[in-house]
Amino acid sequence: MSRTPLIAGNWKMVLDHQQGTLLVQKLDWTLKDAKHDYSAVEVAVLPSHTSLRTVQTLIEGDKLSIALGAQDVSEHDSGAYTGEVSAAMLAKLGVTYVAVGHSERRQYHGETDATVRAKAAKALAAGLTPIVCVGEALEIRKAEQHVEFTVGQVTQALTGLTAEQAAGLVLAYEPVWAIGTGEVATPEDAQEVCAALREAVAELFDRATADAVRVLYGGSVKPASIAAIMRQPDVDGALVGGASTDAGDFAAIVRFRDHPA
C-alpha cells in the first residue's frame, strides 16, 4: 500500500504567535518556490495552543496547503479541568493532527500509556488524527529491550480501538535518547523499530490496518539525515522538533526527495 509521507513540525514551547506566523509564511514561500506537491508529501505544523488561532487564520485566509496540528489534547470532553483543551475545541479551530504521548509529556507531566490511550480515543472521536508517540530511554536501548518496550507502548495505546480507528491514526517513534541531544538513531535503527510497530498493529488488528498506518521517525531530525531515514520502507515521515522552528531547515526536510541519495 502506498502511504503519503507526512512531515510534521513540533514547535514545542519555542515560538510565540507572531514568530509562528512569520515561520509559516516563510515556509509557504520556500515550498512554493520549490513547486512542492503537498499531495506527494504532506506538511503539518504543531504550534503551542496560544498560537493555534493565529496560524489557523493565516492558513485558511491564504488558502495554504499546510495542515494544522496541536501538541496535546485533554482526555476529558469538557468541564472543570483548568488549563485543559478538549478535542472538540481543537476540531472547531480547524486542527487536523494532535500529538499524544510525546516523551516530554510522559517525562514532565507523568502521562501513562492509559492517558495516551484516552487522549487518542478523544481525538479520534472528534475527527482529529492523533500522532501517538512512543520511544525508549537510553538505558532501555542499551539493554536491547527497545523493540519490546515500544511495541508494549503501542499495544497499550491502541487496545480498545477498532481497526477503522487504528487505521486513522499516525504512530511516531521517538527514541528519547535522541531528542534534543544531537544524537540520531541510524536509519537502520529507525527501520527496526518502525517495522516492529507496524507488525504490532497487524497483530492487534490485521495486515490491511497495519499497511494503512503511517509511522514517523522523530529524534533530532535534520536536513542532512532525513533522506537516508526516509529511504527505509517502514518510515513514512518525520516528527521534527528543533529544526521545524527554522523555515529553511524545515523546508529542506520536507523536500527530502531533492537530497542526493
Curated annotation (Swiss-Prot):
Keywords: Cytoplasm, Gluconeogenesis, Glycolysis, Isomerase. Gene3D superfamilies: Aldolase class I (3.20.20.70). The keyword Cytoplasm applies. It comes from the Bacteria. It is found in: Cytoplasm. One of its GO terms (cellular component) is cytosol. The active site is at H102, E174. Pathway: Carbohydrate biosynthesis; gluconeogenesis; Carbohydrate degradation; glycolysis; D-glyceraldehyde 3-phosphate from glycerone phosphate: step 1/1. It catalyses: D-glyceraldehyde 3-phosphate = dihydroxyacetone phosphate. The keyword Acyltransferase does not apply. NCBIfam families: tim. HAMAP family: TIM_B. This is Triosephosphate isomerase. It comes from Kineococcus radiotolerans (strain ATCC BAA-149 / DSM 14245 / SRS30216).
